């Protein structure tokens, strides 16, 4: 059995493997939060969809000199928010892995940016931050005087035609997984992309791994936002 999905799917594959059914897992989740691999199928497509949607929102944000507060997916991981925020030039990015203070990380940052002459702003918020983006927009408007609007992108992020990167990586992982199964029914493995190479791990080992956010990338986002 080839199982495509995230942690929940892999736990199911583990249980099947324990019952003697050869299984190979392929990481497929837009959150990119599978610890054993650098890249999960679906992530790049979702990231590009977010970028396209935010670019459209930015058109009116710029023309009306507003602040747009945009919630993107990512319940436990901020990879989408962080990379999308960098790609669209967000003023502030809030992700669940890093503690934040609205006054310090949003309001003060906007005020500093205003002093440079900027009159439009994008705030990207991962859903896992548990921030009410509508209330945040009201707070921003009250404290900065900048007209603010909120948008929850929702399930539009989950659909769409896969990017070339997703298609190529899915093909490589699928090919690798089938070869593993054909090698004397070798199962109980998870396929992973590590530094552009396709490798595999024991499924129990993979489930026990923990993935952390790239703090250096977060610093880049902070440095280029003003």
Locate the predicted segments by residue.
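Accessory alpha-helical/coil subdomains and C-terminal extensions
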Residues: 4, 15, 22, 42-147, ...
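Short, well-ordered, mixed-charge alpha-helical segments that flank or form enzyme active sites
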Residues: 9-13, 31-35, 76-80, 200
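A broad detector of short, well-ordered amphipathic alpha-helices
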Residues: 11, 79, 83, 168, ...
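Acidic/polar active-site rim loop that often engages polyanionic ligands
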Residues: 26-39, 62-63
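Short gly/pro/ser/thr-enriched loop/turn and capping motifs at secondary-structure boundaries
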Residues: 29-34, 100-102, 155-158
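Short beta-strand elements at the ligand-binding edges of bilobed clamshell
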Residues: 36-47, 161-167
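C-terminal non-catalytic interaction/assembly regions of soluble proteins
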Residues: 132, 138-226
């Amino acid at each position: 059995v080839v199982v495509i999905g995230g942690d929940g799917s892999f736990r199911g594959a583990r249980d099947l493997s324990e019952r003697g059914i050869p299984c190979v897992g392929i990481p497929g989740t837009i959150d990119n939060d599978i610890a054993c691999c650098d890249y999960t199928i679906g992530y790049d497509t979702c990231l590009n969809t977010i970028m396209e949607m935010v670019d459209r929102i930015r058109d009116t944000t710029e023309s009306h000199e507003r602040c747009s507060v945009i919630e993107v997916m990512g319940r436990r991981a901020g990879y989408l928010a962080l990379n999308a925020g960098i790609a669209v030039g967000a003023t502030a990015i809030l992700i669940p892995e890093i503690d934040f203070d609205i006054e310090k990380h949003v309001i003060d940052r906007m005020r500093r940016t205003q002093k440079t002459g900027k009159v439009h702003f994008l705030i990207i918020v991962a859903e896992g931050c548990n921030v009410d983006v509508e209330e945040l927009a009201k707070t921003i408007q009250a404290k900065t005087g900048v007209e603010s609007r909120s948008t929850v992108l929702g399930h539009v992020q989950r659909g769409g035609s896969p990017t070339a990167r997703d298609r190529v990586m899915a093909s490589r992982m699928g090919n690798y997984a089938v070869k593993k199964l054909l090698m004397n029914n070798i199962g109980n493995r998870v396929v992973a992309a590590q530094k552009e190479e396709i490798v595999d791990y024991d499924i129990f080992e993979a489930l026990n791994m923990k993935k952390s956010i790239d703090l250096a990338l977060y610093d880049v986002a902070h440095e280029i936002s003003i």
